Amino acid sequence: MSTKSQVTRRVRTSIATPEDGVHGNNQHKGILDPHLSVLEMLDRQDGDGAGQVEEGAVMTVGKRRVERSLHHSISESWQAIKRSDYSFLSGTHEVGAMHSSVGILSSSDTSEEEAEMRPSAHGTVHLGSSLASPMRQLLVEEDNSCAEEDDCQTVTISMPSSSTSLVMPKLSLSQRLGEPQLLLVGQPARKFWLTIPKCYQKLFDVKNLGMVTRWDVGQRYLAVMVVFHDIAQAPELLDGLCEKAPCPTVIPVCQKGQKSTLAALLKRYTARKCIRVYCSPIIMSNHHEKHRLLKHLHNLCNESESGYETELTVKSKKQHRRPRKKDAGPVALRHWAIWTASFTIGIGIGCCISLMATTRFTFFSSAPLPLTAVIPAQIPSSVASDKPPHRLVPHFYMLCKTTIRQLGTSLRLFFFEKFESRTWVHIFGMDLHSDDPLASLGRLMPLDFIML
């Protein structure tokens, strides 16, 4: 019983009295466990009734004080926790959240974390053994060092938690880059290929014409460069090329002295629309022209790889179009033609108007001239047949001259009789009394042109 009494005394000393609860600020605020009543019951067997009543009163007062202190400690328990005390918990929570967004966590991991973070009945948080493991400490240290030292790494780590995603487009290439795009055929094709720089050799694919298929000439290659060695075999080579594809694009290369003959042959094939000649024949030994051609073809192939239409890929559309009108002449010539036609039409209209307006004009003359008065001489009735034949030409000339003169006189008299008016002349107060009607008409005609 001595042992029980000692335990009872220790428990009683741990209970604060009302005076001690007010003045004892440095004492520990203990919590009564449920088994304290059992110890009191064991101790009650040796005591009397008065002692039991006193002990019961002490227990009641002590229990109320403990409950009040417990409520006060629980309400202010979050204020007693410093930021440094739970910083590792927040870091662990962030690492766990990031890990959950990246991977898949099992149910056991979640239960362990919940058990580790659950507070006990005493108001304290008990950390499990898993938080003290080296792996958890390593993750916390790495996260803190990344947040303090490098912001870029922090952004990189937090990227998996974002909801945005990048979708790469699907790319498809119909033709591999760097693949030969020009076909090189002919007997000295290999020799020509070896003489060009290596940067241009990748553009050509050297093959025999018999090994080339229709798909190669029509679809795979942009053009066919034909190297002619013997001009006598050129028609056979061109005919074989025309059989592979309809109207292929040909880049001719010939030997020295064959350019004119080959140009005439290609012109005949072009007229029949069997082939399309990309350029005039290039002499194989002319390095300047050859280099210019290769450089131009290299640029066209690069543009074709990048997706742009080139001169080699675009088919000729001039055959389907209507023939264009011929270009008009120079602007100055066109203006001169317009001005000349305008003046001519204006003068003609002015003359007609002036003649119609002067229909009432009459010349004051004593008497009209007879038709026979203006005839200078009589035309001989006949020509003697006995004259020599060399006199016929002068007589025929005199006959035509006299006829034209009489016709002019008759027309002049006819116009004098029809257009007899001088109304517009009287407006200006002019008096044209004259015995010579021809002189009067000569003065009137310039005035008519001025009136225009």
Swiss-Prot record:
Keywords: Autophagy, Membrane, Mitochondrion, Mitochondrion outer membrane, Transmembrane, Transmembrane helix, Vacuole
Subcellular location: Mitochondrion outer membrane; Vacuole membrane; Preautophagosomal structure membrane
Gene Ontology BP terms: autophagy
Stretches the record annotates as Disordered: 1-28
Any one cellular-component term (Gene Ontology): vacuolar membrane
Main subcellular location of this protein, as a coarse class: mitochondrion
Transmembrane stretches, start-end: 336-356
Membrane topology: Single-pass membrane protein
Main function: Mitophagy-specific receptor that recruits the autophagic machinery to mitochondria and regulates selective degradation of mitochondria. Mitophagy contributes to regulate mitochondrial quantity and quality by eliminating the mitochondria to a basal level to fulfill cellular energy requirements and preventing excess ROS production. Recruits ATG11 to the surface of mitochondria. Also promotes autophagy-dependent peroxisome degradation.
Recorded family membership: Belongs to the ATG32 family.
Protein name as catalogued: Autophagy-related protein 32
